[in-house]
Amino acid sequence: MTRIALGAFLHETNTFAPTKATYADFVHGGGWPAMSSGRDVPKMMRCMNAGLAGFIEAAEAEAWDLVPTIACGASPSAHVTKDAFERIVNVIVDGIASARPLDGVYLDLHGAMVTEHFDDGEGELLARVRKVIGEELPLVASLDLHANVTPKMVEHADALIAYRTYPHIDMANTGRAAARHLALLLKTKKRFAKAFRQLAFLIPINWQATLDEPAKSIYERLAALESRAVPTLSFAPGFPAADFEHCGASVFAYGRTQQDANAAADAIVALVESHEDDFYGKIYSPDEGVCHAMECAKTATRPIVIADTQDNPGAGGNSDTTGMLRALVRNKAQAAALGVIYDPQSAKAAHAAGQGASVRLALGGKSGIRGDAPYQQTFVVENISGGDFVATGPYYGGRAMQMGPSAALRIGDVRVVVASHKAQLADQSMYRYVGIEPTAQKILVNKSSVHFRADFEPIAAKLLICAAPGAMPADPASLPWTRLRPGIRLRPNGPAFTPATKAPITG
């Protein structure tokens, strides 16, 4: 029987964010399932939109004998601590070593992890696994669409396969694709030639959305280029908030011959470069966006949905800035709701006050973001919740969410979801679990960039993007870069990065 070791370790690192990812964050998971290990992994990772879940489903259909090590992820943030990285990687590597003899290894990774002691978290992990399994055993990994792929990652994996949708509704499908490629490697007992290309400009995350052009057509062309000669081809637009040499978009292809791989990769690079002008769109200030939403809402029959993109916890934001809340209240928005503000202290105070009570709070604004501060006002506690529910929309895809003590607060006709844990508001259930019906609102403000669109676009009359203070600037050129590779453009057609000096890793 074919014997495959597997594991999952996912983190998207914004090196400019205020909060690091500790081991406890991986234990809880944030928007990811809670940490599981050994035989508990397949029990936990079923019937959900996750790479590991899709791989397990496909592997069981092949009747492979699976040897799980550990599965965990944490909300995007600043660097993964050395303690967390070493503890989790040791479980993976030791588990793989003790599972031998093996026929192959699969890892579900993000591809944009930076740690306190390594710029390239996934490259380091893959190198350690390769050292244990040797050069002959196939090693395949699935990656996030936002992966900052490095030469080290490409070197040590036999195949890297990235998501093709943003919102990421194909995470499980990517795991299935990884299983198919691993099966092909096992059947043919041959390695494919690799081609790896890095693009010359950073792509803002809002314009990486595959529901829109130019990404939509790029991924359609990418799928059409796959064949028996090129069994897998990926384009990762990257995560433009990790200050290290290999931050940015990349293309990676696997072909029967080097010529096949090179031709496929170069075709996608040329297509992306031809659309450099198109990775751009309208971004509103908080007041401008709220006023425009209020005007649209006068005639709309469905909610106007605003992305509070710069405080997106799915991109390293702390999900606690108050700029959009202030704009809603200042402009006297009606039938408006905002979520999720991460503030355990305020959630605790709301629970202590009780449903129906009025409570004075210093809400949010505790992460030290420049231009932001706690919002000190009196709120009505409309509802409270323990924070456990299932997110049923296309992005989370059935994940059990654990937001901790939570509440629906009201000020004027603006309602706010406050929670004790942070997760990107990408599911309608993240309003409903505290008693707010999203379809009944005129305006919704979601702390998200793109993932919310999977569940909210069907109920929205219009989508807007606003830039209130936050850790993930919509324009990557506004970040204080010091360690990128020389010459890379900081936005499409933007200024080129010129390093003052070679800076050391900063954790």
PLM ranges: what are they?
Residues 186-216:
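Internal, active-site/partner-interface "lid" segment
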Residues 3-5, 65-67, 103-105, 137-141, ...:
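Structural motif
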Residues 2, 206-413, 417-421:
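Hard-cation-handling environments
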Residues 1-58:
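N-terminal amphipathic/basic leader segments beginning at the initiator methionine
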Residues 68, 273, 390-507:
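Extended hydrophobic packing segments that form well-structured cores
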Residues 1, 60-68, 94-103, 290-304, ...:
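Glycine-rich phosphate/diphosphate-binding loops that line cofactor/substrate pockets in enzymes
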Residues 56-84, 88-96:
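Low-complexity, highly charged intrinsically disordered N-terminal segments
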Residues 5-12, 17, 26-27, 76-78, ...:
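Active-site histidine-anchored catalytic micro-motif
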